[in-house]
Amino acid sequence: ERQERYMNIAVISTYVDSYIFPPVVRGIERVLSKKGYTTQIAFTGNRVSREQDILNNLIDKDIIDGLIVEPAKSALPNPNLHYYQELKERGIPILFFNSRYPDLELPCVSMNDEQVGKKAVEYLIKNGHRNIGGVFKSDDGQGHLRYKGFLSGMLGAGIKVKDANVVWLDTEDFLDLDQWADYLFRRLESCTGVVCYNDEVAYVLSGLCEKRGIAIPDQLSVVSIDNSDLATLAGVKLTSFPHPMEALGRKAAENMISMIENPYFDGNYLFDSDIIERDSVKVLKQPHK
């Protein structure tokens, strides 16, 4: 355990302009400043090279008491793990949020992504859908966990998952989903419903459907995750599972303080989420009571 206290916590996040980060950082800062900590924030843009620069800098300066970090491309092999090990060996507690690197045994505060993926597909199944597709993010851990839940929901209902109906896209693809439109609709052609990785995907997908004259929910039902402002801005308001956002930030900060005060504290925490029903899902048959 480190003896010297700098009253300084570093926060590393992927995107400054995502709809999730501002409320998360608000939650983090509120809790930390009450305890007398300053927060320094850096952004990776979900790029591993940028993450390397930031970690290097933190190790050189050596003036932090703890690190709260959203990993870059958490589903892919990461060349920066030794920097985290180095910080850990110096007695600096590290807490991940939203996702984690599977190779590092470090705690994480996040949404229960697997459970949410399962609940999302179960909601479509309950409303009579059986040909269900998914659009998931390939380079972030949340995408894999949401897919894992999606699979278990489908298999639990005795429905075979058609791999052709599951589309994987990465961070770079997300920047220009329009260019994937033909491909997306080809893959989802036989589906009556789709689980979207998040509201960003669902929002863009609903816009693409509009352009092609595909009616949501009559021709395609959409369930999304995050319940951000985008869910209500879409042409058809999206049924979505809320991300804990500010509550997640507060929890991460509380757990970080506990980890600084007690090196044996378990900083892991998963947030449950319950669906917010709007207009993007069609009932194909009456749900079983």
Where are these regions (language model features)?
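Short helix-capping segments at alpha-helix termini
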Residues: 32-35, 90, 155-161, 188-189, ...
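Glycine-rich phosphate/diphosphate-binding loops that line cofactor/substrate pockets in enzymes
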Residues: 3, 123-132
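Hinge/beta->alpha junction and helix N-cap segments in small-molecule ligand-binding domains
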Residues: 13-23, 41-50, 72-75, 99, ...
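Short acidic/polar active-site loop segments enriched in Thr and Asp
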Residues: 64-65, 129-131, 192
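Flexible loop/turn connectors
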Residues: 178-289
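Alpha-helical recognition/docking segments in bacterial nutrient-uptake
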Residues: 4-122, 183-186
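Short acidic capping loops at alpha-helix termini that bridge into adjacent secondary structure
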Residues: 131, 161-165, 216-221
